């Protein structure tokens, strides 16, 4: 679509919404912008681009959708919104920022520009960051963008203005972004895993999986290499007979192209086929789930023919991301980890399975309609006690009851940390891995992590002070 003079309704004024406003205004579109919040972010910035009479805050109204040529929808706004559905039925296109980005790349990017696209319930930000570091270490100019930030269109405009195109785009994509994307042509793409998530937005996990699988729906040709997790049946079922597949998993590779784990000496190695590549003990990030992340990142980078040596060097030095299995403190023989980014079951299960020690688990929050029963087995295997807080604490407790692990209820994060420290024995881990969203008690998962860390630091100071007094 040529957007010059076209009437486009942009829904949402968050980071993605403002990026679409800026991009579409460059293309000469006639914009109106709406957000269901009465005081949305970026209102002042948008009012500099869009006339005040074309900006609407509060519940969406039918008249907003009259006479428009397209809807540019932010990931935070559901396509299932009745007024959006009514517009779709009338033939109005509904697009998102990644669709606009994909069309722009086709038009403006130099030939040979590569795209690696990453999605999944858990680990997608980590893998996207890994890929960025690995590609950079291999000597290519890389732009990491999408759900990870910056917004893809913001990164695109910055690159265009500087006339400095990257060799490769590493894109983290959410299911919400993929729903409205049909023109993206990645050279390789992965769905890392699937676990129950966002079931407040999807009717079933099958519908959620179908949204994720759109990452492989490359138009015009089947040149996208599918990087598939063979340990996840729903992901493995996404294999397309017209595309090339490379699998990764925690089992030994069966073919020369597959990535997996192999024993070697007293260690376990990342491997491709029968070739030992890197000891898992050399990874700076802990846990088997991070070994799987590293294997996926290797498979993606090798799909665009980058050499192994700089990729492996980057993996040795990659230190992980904030609030994802991040060590906060260690005192009195107890280690505290912040995994506040764990907003669903799958990420909490992965975190627990990554530990060989006894864990005091802090969990709970807004469960987003998830079935918590998959927590029962890892809790039974790895957890000494569970400390629960938040709106859906009772649902979590019910799901893990059969594990016979003691459950303690608290009302604040401070109390959760205090109780956990009292329960912990020498050599134990206190792990904040909530398996839930944070908005029932906190501004976001970062705020939840900050409150957790502050509570840990307070106990640490008291402990150190007491120890000094005793001496």
UniProtKB/Swiss-Prot annotation:
* Reaction catalyzed: UDP-N-acetyl-alpha-D-muramoyl-L-alanine + D-glutamate + ATP = UDP-N-acetyl-alpha-D-muramoyl-L-alanyl-D-glutamate + ADP + phosphate + H(+)
Q: What is its EC number?
A: 6.3.2.9
Q: Where does ATP bind?
A: 120-126
Kind of enzyme, top EC level?
Answer: ligase
Q: Which Pfam families match?
A: Mur_ligase_C (PF02875), Mur_ligase_M (PF08245), MurD-like_N (PF21799)
Question: What pathway is this protein a component of?
Answer: Cell wall biogenesis; peptidoglycan biosynthesis
Q: Which domain of life is it from?
A: Bacteria
Keyword check for Protease, yes or no.
no
Q: Which GO terms describe its cellular component?
A: cytoplasm
List, in alphabetical order, the Gene Ontology terms for molecular function in this entry. Answer: ATP binding; UDP-N-acetylmuramoylalanine-D-glutamate ligase activity
A single GO BP term for this record reads: regulation of cell shape
Which UniProt keyword terms apply here? ATP-binding, Cell cycle, Cell division, Cell shape, Cell wall biogenesis/degradation, Cytoplasm, Ligase, Nucleotide-binding, Peptidoglycan synthesis
Family the UniProt entry places it in? Belongs to the MurCDEF family.
Functional summary from the UniProt entry:
Cell wall formation. Catalyzes the addition of glutamate to the nucleotide precursor UDP-N-acetylmuramoyl-L-alanine (UMA).
What is the protein named?
A: UDP-N-acetylmuramoylalanine--D-glutamate ligase
């Amino acid at each position: 679509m040529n957007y010059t003079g076209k009437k486009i309704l942009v829904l949402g004024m968050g980071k993605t919404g403002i990026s679409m406003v800026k991009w579409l205004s460059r293309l000469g579109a006639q914009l109106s912008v709406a957000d269901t919040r009465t005081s949305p972010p970026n209102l002042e910035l948008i009012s500099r681009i869009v006339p005040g009479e074309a900006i609407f805050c509060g519940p969406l109204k039918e008249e907003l959708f009259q006479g428009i040529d397209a809807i540019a929808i932010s990931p935070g706004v559901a396509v299932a919104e009745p007024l959006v559905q009514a517009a779709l039925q009338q033939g109005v296109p509904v697009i998102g920022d990644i669709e606009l980005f994909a069309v722009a790349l086709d038009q403006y990017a130099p030939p040979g520009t590569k795209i690696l696209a990453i999605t999944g319930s858990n680990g997608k930000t980590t893998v996207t960051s890994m890929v960025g570091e690995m590609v950079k270490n291999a000597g290519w100019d890389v732009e990491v963008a999408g759900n990870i930030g910056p917004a893809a269109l913001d990164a695109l405009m910055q690159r265009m203005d500087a006339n400095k195109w990257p060799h490769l785009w590493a894109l983290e994509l959410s299911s919400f972004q993929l729903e409205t994307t049909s023109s993206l042509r990645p050279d390789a793409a992965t769905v890392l895993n699937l676990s129950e998530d966002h079931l407040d937005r999807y009717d079933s996990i099958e519908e959620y999986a179908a949204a994720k699988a759109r990452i492989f729906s490359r138009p015009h040709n089947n040149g996208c290499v599918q990087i598939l997790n063979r340990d996840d049946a729903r992901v493995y079922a996404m294999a397309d007979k017209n595309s090339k597949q490379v699998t990764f998993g925690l089992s030994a590779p069966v073919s020369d192209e597959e990535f997996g784990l192999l024993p070697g000496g007293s260690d376990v190695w990342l491997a491709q086929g029968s070739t030992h590549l890197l000891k898992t003990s050399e990874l700076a990030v802990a846990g088997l789930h991070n070994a799987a992340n590293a294997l996926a990142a290797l498979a993606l980078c090798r799909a665009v023919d980058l050499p192994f040596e700089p990729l492996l060097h980057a993996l040795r030095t990659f230190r992980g991301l904030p609030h994802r299995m991040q060590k906060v403190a260690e005192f009195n023989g107890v280690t505290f980890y912040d995994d506040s980014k764990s907003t669903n079951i799958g990420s909490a299960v992965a975190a627990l399975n990554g530990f060989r020690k006894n864990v005091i688990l802090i969990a709970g929050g807004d469960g987003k309609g998830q079935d918590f029963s998959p927590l029962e087995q890892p809790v039974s295997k790895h957890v000494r006690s569970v400390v629960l807080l938040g709106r859906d604490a009772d649902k979590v407790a019910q799901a893990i009851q059969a594990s016979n692990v003691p459950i303690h209820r608290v009302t604040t994060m401070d109390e959760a940390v205090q109780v956990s420290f009292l329960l912990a024995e020498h050599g134990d881990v206190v792990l904040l891995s909530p398996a839930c969203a944070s908005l029932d008690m906190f501004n976001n998962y970062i705020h939840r992590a900050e409150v957790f860390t502050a509570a840990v630091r307070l106990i640490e100071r008291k402990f150190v002070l007491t120890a000094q007094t005793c001496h």
